[in-house]
Curated annotation (Swiss-Prot):
Functional note: Catalyzes the reversible interconversion of serine and glycine with a modified folate serving as the one-carbon carrier. Also exhibits a pteridine-independent aldolase activity toward beta-hydroxyamino acids, producing glycine and aldehydes, via a retro-aldol mechanism.
Modified residues (N6-(pyridoxal phosphate)lysine): K226
GO biological process, one term: tetrahydrofolate interconversion
Entry's family note: Belongs to the SHMT family.
A GO cellular component annotation in the UniProt record: cytoplasm
Pfam family, one: SHMT
Cofactor(s) named in the record: pyridoxal 5'-phosphate
Keyword annotations: Amino-acid biosynthesis, Cytoplasm, One-carbon metabolism, Pyridoxal phosphate, Transferase
Organism: Pyrobaculum arsenaticum (strain DSM 13514 / JCM 11321 / PZ6)
Underlying gene: glyA
Name listed for the protein in its UniProt record: Serine hydroxymethyltransferase
Gene3D superfamilies per the UniProt record, alphabetical: Aspartate Aminotransferase, domain 1 (3.90.1150.10), Type I PLP-dependent aspartate aminotransferase-like (Major domain) (3.40.640.10)
């Protein structure tokens, strides 16, 4: 018998699993689910191990199999991205960002990036990572009509401020940033260019979003668990050979010691699966995002950037100020088992009072949903926003999800493999 308090915690985990995997429509743009195979190999002994240092140069013994996996994972990502340097040791996208800033920007240096209301991530801003490293920030200007960076005004900002680093990419990211144009301007001013690819990394691997390294960026940073449906983790990929040592030292010993080694095998599985299934998956994700946006507009819940076709990524952004704002709407949708997040939009006076919500279709696409299902999701959302009791919508959402429980775009597993993994960990004999 387990102690009661442990039974209670286990029950919470099981209830959560059932709720999020089987009963909700998850539209959080920064989340996803691993394939069954990736999730299986994520359960491994490396979860309790250390491997400080780099492949072949560790501060601990017992790392020969860690070295093997990290080496093949690094090389496979380098080939996929056309990078001369890849580091899979950062434990998150933010840690990857911080390490890159530390390596490329001198103390007291200047970074040009987007503020949060224009889609920049908090780690690109002085409320987050830049403040921690005491770096200065200049804002990249925004063109509301194009819902993108204003290249002409950005040229003036970069030429006048002469930043050490220009950051592109973001957390609200509907359309590819003008990477090539900004990279040319930045390089002429002596700045490095970093593209935070966390949200669109799976779309890059899947070939439906431009590869920033081929567009002129010096560095890609990313997480490995959004449109790239792997375990939570981070990655740096670069084409700056003169800064490799600085990047390596920034990752360790400055910002990490333990790299959460158990994620390596699952990340490798995910990369191989994306090589096999990623092109179709990425194409479907972008199609579904556009379909959801169009269906929401038909339901009287119009997303932003209609004139531009709403989106070219996995994301849809909706101004819900007339429905009570982002806080209220996100909470009300959760009552109906529709999970979204509140999000600031470019015209908001304060990011603490966001007028919008952000939706992402990558996880529901992973469960096999297509354009028809996006139209059904739009109807569920519209019912809640029109004032219908969320409890009734919740019942319909749970019933709807029953047909979409199998994770697609990955390899299958069988009981024999599950038994091998469990026995290798002595979970049973």
């Amino acid at each position: 018998m387990l102690p009661k308090e442990l039974e209670e915690i286990i029950d919470v985990v099981l209830v959560h699993n059932n709720w999020r995997r089987r009963e909700t429509i998850n539209l959080i743009a920064s989340e996803n689910v691993m394939s069954p195979l990736a999730e299986l190999v994520y359960l491994n002994d490396m979860a309790g191990r250390y491997a400080e240092g780099t492949v072949g140069n560790r501060y601990y013994q017992g790392t020969k199999y860690v070295d093997l996996i990290e080496d093949v994972l690094t090389k496979r990502f380098a080939k996929a991205l056309g990078a001369t340097y890849v580091d899979v040791r950062p434990v998150s996208g933010t840690v990857a960002n911080l390490a890159t800033y530390f390596a490329l920007v001198p103390e007291g240096g200047v970074v040009a990036s987007l503020p949060v209301k224009y889609g920049g991530h908090i780690s690109h801003n002085t409320v987050g990572g830049l403040k921690a490293l005491r770096l200065k920030m200049v804002e990249l200007p925004w063109d509301l009509d194009r819902f993108n960076i204003d290249v002409d005004r950005a040229r003036k900002v970069i030429e006048e401020a002469k930043p050490n680093l220009v950051i592109l990419g973001g957390s609200l990211y509907l359309f590819p940033h003008p990477i090539r144009e900004i990279a040319e301007i930045a390089k002429a001013s002596g700045a490095y260019v970093l593209h935070d690819s966390a949200h669109v990394f799976g779309l890059i691997i899947g070939g439906v979003f431009p590869n920033p390294l081929k567009e002129g960026a010096h560095v890609i940073t990313t997480s490995t668990h959004k449109t790239f449906p792997g375990p939570q983790g981070g990655l740096i990929a670069a084409v700056v050979e003169d800064k490799v040592n600085d990047l390596q030292r920034a990752v360790f010993p400055v910002f990490t010691s333990n790299y959460h080694l158990h994620r390596y095998a699952a990340t490798y599985v995910t990369l191989v699966e994306m090589e096999h299934f990623g092109a179709e998956y990425a194409r479907r994700v972008v199609e579904n995002a556009r379909a959801l946006a169009e269906a929401l507009a038909e339901q009287g819940v119009p997303p932003v950037a209609e004139a531009l076709g709403y989106t070219r990524t996995h994301q849809v952004a909706v101004d819900v100020s007339k429905f009570g704002g982002g806080d209220k709407v996100a909470a009300k949708l959760e009552e109906a088992n529709i999970i979204v997040n509140k999000n600031a939009l470019p015209w908001d006076k304060s990011v603490l009072k966001p007028s919008g919500i952000r939706l992402g279709v990558q996880e529901m696409t992973r469960f096999g949903m297509g354009k028809d299902e996006m139209r059904e999701i739009a109807k569920f959302i519209a019912r809640v926003l029109s004032g219908e009791d969320p409890a009734g919508v919740r019942r319909d959402v749970a019933e709807f999800r029953k047909a979409y429980l199998e994770i697609k775009y990955g390899f299958k597993i069988d009981r024999e493999l599950v038994d091998k993994v469990f026995k290798s960990l002595s979970l049973y004999t």
